[in-house]
Swiss-Prot record:
It comes from Bos taurus (Bovine). Component of the eukaryotic translation initiation factor 3 (eIF-3) complex, which is composed of 13 subunits: EIF3A, EIF3B, EIF3C, EIF3D, EIF3E, EIF3F, EIF3G, EIF3H, EIF3I, EIF3J, EIF3K, EIF3L and EIF3M. The eIF-3 complex appears to include 3 stable modules: module A is composed of EIF3A, EIF3B, EIF3G and EIF3I; module B is composed of EIF3F, EIF3H, and EIF3M; and module C is composed of EIF3C, EIF3D, EIF3E, EIF3K and EIF3L. EIF3C of module C binds EIF3B of module A and EIF3H of module B, thereby linking the three modules. EIF3J is a labile subunit that binds to the eIF-3 complex via EIF3B. The modification Phosphoserine is found at S399, S442. This is Eukaryotic translation initiation factor 3 subunit E. It comes from the Eukaryota.
Amino acid sequence: MAEYDLTTRIAHFLDRHLVFPLLEFLSVKEIYNEKELLQGKLDLLSDTNMVDFAMDVYKNLYSDDIPHALREKRTTVVAQLKQLQAETEPIVKMFEDPETTRQMQSTRDGRMLFDYLADKHGFRQEYLDTLYRYAKFQYECGNYSGAAEYLYFFRVLVPATDRNALSSLWGKLASEILMQNWDAAMEDLTRLKETIDNNSVSSPLQSLQQRTWLIHWSLFVFFNHPKGRDNIIDLFLYQPQYLNAIQTMCPHILRYLTTAVITNKDVRKRRQVLKDLVKVIQQESYTYKDPITEFVECLYVNFDFDGAQKKLRECESVLVNDFFLVACLEDFIENARLFIFETFCRIHQCISINMLADKLNMTPEEAERWIVNLIRNARLDAKIDSKLGHVVMGNNAVSPYQQVIEKTKSLSFRSQMLAMNIEKKLNQNSRSEAPNWAAQDSGFY
């Protein structure tokens, strides 16, 4: 379903290396012409050092021989790599020393570590630039593990004021994402976010741009890390600077926020967050909508159950063709049906199983089994009258006291998030660089 594909929009905020997994996914889904996708890969590869990959793509796209320019570029890249390896070899040997490793693990002070290396191994300031260049070259060649390793060494040693400090954080995050090291990527994402948020030198426009990039890069982490669906809600919905970036620069991100809320495993948090999400979806409905956001609008704004059922069917097609959301399909459908059911039950005391099956896009037998499982798992206070084919709801009236308690809990949660954001703002550190990893040569695609 190319109509709802967001790859082109998202790719504008990603480093070109991060776009390759998205193109591979689209190729498998066959929703675009394969030759167009191959040409897209070739265009992306033109400004990287992954020459062998470019040659393979060229062979698949064209029947003629590999262009001379590509062969020449390969020779140049190999020569540059050998030169950088020779320059970096003495530096790498320093880090391979067991005593250096112990020092790196025991001290968090980059200056102290730098002084130690200078005393013991003759480490010099220019070695940092050499290390950074080599890490970046490794990244451009597609050796992400090497890039991550050298960028870690670089980050440990450089002060926050170094001209490549922020750039190296972007590179480390990209490398960990491309290696699918989700724990390390989550740590790097958190570190990068703190650096951006504490930067008092960047202009508001630069900060907005940095946060917009971070929002898009974070999708890889949030939809693969076990805690990702909690963290994405806290960041996108309850941190005003990031919600503002979404509303200003990339309202299409609401698709991912909505999916994270619907598939969140914490039922209490999910219900609490839904009210705030609905407000944002309503505010932005004039700038962005798709079946996923429209499903929420149909159900919680218009109480249009037929419309919600129709949108849920469309959501399946959207999810299965979305690189980030395809793994959420089962959770989404299951929880969306539960949302429809819960909302429907607030209005009706006695419900026909046939009517319910129609609302949930299930057969009557499937609907009955589904409700039985809900009752068995203590997620539903109801009884089934098999003779009449009815579901009779229990007495779910909420006392005024309970309503006050629930509203207080919600207010407490929001106050806590606000206090955390204020505390972070007060503890600002000055950082001056803009996120330009892979931007000097290849730019953000």
